[in-house]
Amino acid sequence: DFLTFFSGEAGSKYEYRERETIDPSQIKSSMLNFSIWFQYGNPSTTLEKHVYISDEFTGLYKDNFEADSLLVEQFEKDGKWKELVPQSAFPTAAVGNADLATPYSFDMKEYMGKRIAIAICYRGIDNTVAQSKMYFERMRINNVMPSGQEAEYSAGSFGFTPINMKNKWNLKDQTSMTKDREYGTVTNN
């Protein structure tokens, strides 16, 4: 047998026991937060870097890497990604650790009730100079209710699927990825 206790305080009310979603009108603010930092080299010499968002992206097949990668690239060529972080807003110097990362915060109210996709674009330079390693960390959504109650959701609860566009390059940092390089990540973010 299982016994579930509903204390009656915000977030633990019996009347909401079967609720799966919250009506957007019941959310006062919703902010997407994350941080970016670079290690090594000179990040200002990086060819291209952006963070994009879209509520029009059709989604990934997740079993056909070629089709998925072409879809992501075509979406960029067609200009359908909305830029969250333009190249000019990225950190311009490498730092020693995540505590010195540049924080970013974006209002998500316009995306309530919609499926979204986020793309991180990083195109490095040739190997004649040290390549900066980019860290995209601490991604979360913070919701505030009219009562002042706050709820934080980490990236692990978003249901995102990573797509590793450089999986066939056999990069040094991917050697530990013995399976699913197409849809895997180097770290467990």
Regions found by a protein language model. Give the residues of each.
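Polar/charged alpha-helical tracts
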Residues: 25-26, 73, 77-78, 109-110
